[in-house]
Regions:
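Amphipathic, Lys/Arg-enriched alpha-helical "gate/interface" segment within cytosolic domains
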Residues: 1-4, 9-17, 22-63, 67-140
């Protein structure tokens, strides 16, 4: 669905207001350099979900075929906001070629890259608990 970007689209697959998480699939070209997609994604989707208590975001990015970076201002801002609520942002299954610019700009500090090719075999709750458990184990 359209959220304001000319090149990146998304589908909100699932939202759990009790456990404060959502699963969103991204499709297309993520272009911060020209379109400032992260600003639109944060303002139009992230901020609206956070107003409703969502602090844990799972973005499935296996169909994001290109990534063009700019600065990290909105990544940092979003990271700070979800961290204040003990939340996190995960980018799941971003293609290796797409990850290069993402990693070069050190954006995984704000949105962690994770691989889980079989994500479709999980119900949303089980996908969330698997990711959340893995993140908690890394911290401890």
């Amino acid at each position: 669905d359209d959220f304001g970007s000319k090149t990146l689209y998304l589908k909100i697959i699932y939202v759990d207001y009790e456990l404060h998480f959502c699963v969103i699939e991204l499709i297309g070209e993520w272009n911060d350099a020209i379109e400032n997609d992260i600003m639109m994604l944060k303002r139009e989707i992230g901020d609206e979900l956070m107003k409703k208590g969502i602090s844990k975001f799972i973005f499935i990015a296996e169909n994001v075929l290109n990534f063009h970076s700019s600065d990290n201002e909105y990544y940092r801002e979003w990271y700070d906001e979800v961290s204040d609520e003990e939340g996190w942002i995960i980018i799941l299954n971003m293609p290796a070629a797409t990850q290069q610019d993402f990693i070069k700009k050190k954006l995984p500090y704000y949105m962690e890259l994770m691989e889980l090719p079989e994500w479709r075999s999980y119900k949303p709750y089980h996908l969330f608990t698997k990711i959340d458990t893995e993140l908690r184990q890394r911290i401890s």
